């Protein structure tokens, strides 16, 4: 929005570095699902991650209240509850006009089971903070296709 704003650009640089550190800690279900969607439908990985993010957050965050408080604080959100955190993330996604479902970028419902099965074989799946069964991953994929937010 403000390419000449050095403070904002510096903040993005720090965020990029933190993202790299997070990458080393493990990627989880957002990436596992996105890897498989991208492989089959040639979607942009970052966009696919952004679409899937709210669905997986809803699945993961109830078991991560302490981390949600730290993330909310770092993002300067006033309310540190799980639901407020997800709501704030969704507002950001809306603001930058991220599609609200994978179907909007050409992913059909018919692939949900196949994507879920493949996602569970992805190395990123093993680092998800909450274990998920096939049925749970299938529901996450289907929700992401129909209406992620």
Describe these PLM feature segments.
Residues 8-11, 29, 48-52, 67, ...:
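Residue-level detector of well-ordered alpha-helical segments, enriched
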């Amino acid at each position: 929005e403000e390419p000449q704003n050095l403070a904002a650009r510096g903040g993005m640089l720090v965020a990029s570095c933190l993202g790299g550190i997070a990458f080393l800690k493990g990627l989880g279900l957002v990436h596992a699902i996105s890897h498989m969607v991208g492989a089959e439908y040639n979607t942009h990985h970052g966009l696919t991650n952004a679409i899937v993010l709210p669905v997986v957050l809803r699945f993961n965050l109830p078991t991560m209240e302490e981390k949600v408080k730290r993330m909310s604080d770092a993002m300067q959100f006033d309310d540190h509850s799980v639901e407020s955190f997800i709501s704030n993330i969704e507002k950001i996604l809306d603001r930058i006009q991220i599609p609200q479902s994978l179907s909007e970028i050409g992913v059909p419902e018919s692939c949900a089971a196949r994507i879920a099965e493949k996602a569970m074989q992805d190395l990123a799946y093993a680092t998800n903070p909450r274990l998920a069964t096939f049925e749970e991953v299938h529901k996450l994929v289907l929700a992401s296709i129909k209406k992620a937010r």
